[in-house]
């Protein structure tokens, strides 16, 4: 006979607050560089929605806006430095 080990209590999942709703942003624009920089890591990568706390649709719009801003030379593709 084997005995089951008691399981530790599971903490309830706490959802991150949406930063776009907190800032009352209705439209994501590639020209709003200050907003887009919040969703880019210090290495220049686009942060995942698991980290940022945005919805799927908002993440798609953010990534498109960041890519457009990079193409228009408003944002760098990568950081300069070591």
Swiss-Prot record:
Q: Which InterPro entries match?
A: Ribosomal_bS18 (IPR001648), Ribosomal_bS18_CS (IPR018275), Ribosomal_bS18_sf (IPR036870)
Instruction: Name a single GO biological process.
Output: translation
Q: Which PANTHER family match?
A: 30S RIBOSOMAL PROTEIN S18, SMALL RIBOSOMAL SUBUNIT PROTEIN BS18M
Q: What Gene Ontology molecular-function terms does this entry list?
A: small ribosomal subunit rRNA binding; structural constituent of ribosome
> Which organism encodes this protein?
Bifidobacterium adolescentis (strain ATCC 15703 / DSM 20083 / NCTC 11814 / E194a)
Q: What is this protein called?
A: Small ribosomal subunit protein bS18
CC annotations in GO: cytosolic small ribosomal subunit
| Biological role | Binds as a heterodimer with protein bS6 to the central domain of the 16S rRNA, where it helps stabilize the platform of the 30S subunit.
Provide the alphabetized UniProt keywords.
Answer: Ribonucleoprotein, Ribosomal protein, RNA-binding, rRNA-binding
| Gene designation | rpsR
- Similarity field: Belongs to the bacterial ribosomal protein bS18 family.
Q: Which Pfam families match?
A: Ribosomal_S18 (PF01084)
According to the record's subunit comment, the protein's assembly and interactions are: Part of the 30S ribosomal subunit. Forms a tight heterodimer with protein bS6.
| Membrane-crossing residue ranges in chain numbering | none
């Amino acid at each position: 006979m084997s005995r089951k080990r008691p399981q530790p209590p599971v903490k309830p999942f706490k959802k991150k607050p949406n930063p776009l709703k907190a800032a009352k942003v209705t439209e994501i624009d590639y020209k709003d560089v200050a907003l887009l920089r919040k969703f880019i890591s210090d290495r220049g990568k686009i942060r995942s929605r698991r980290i940022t706390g945005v919805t799927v649709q908002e993440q798609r719009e953010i990534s498109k806006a960041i890519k457009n801003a990079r193409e228009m030379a408003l944002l760098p593709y990568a950081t300069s430095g070591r």
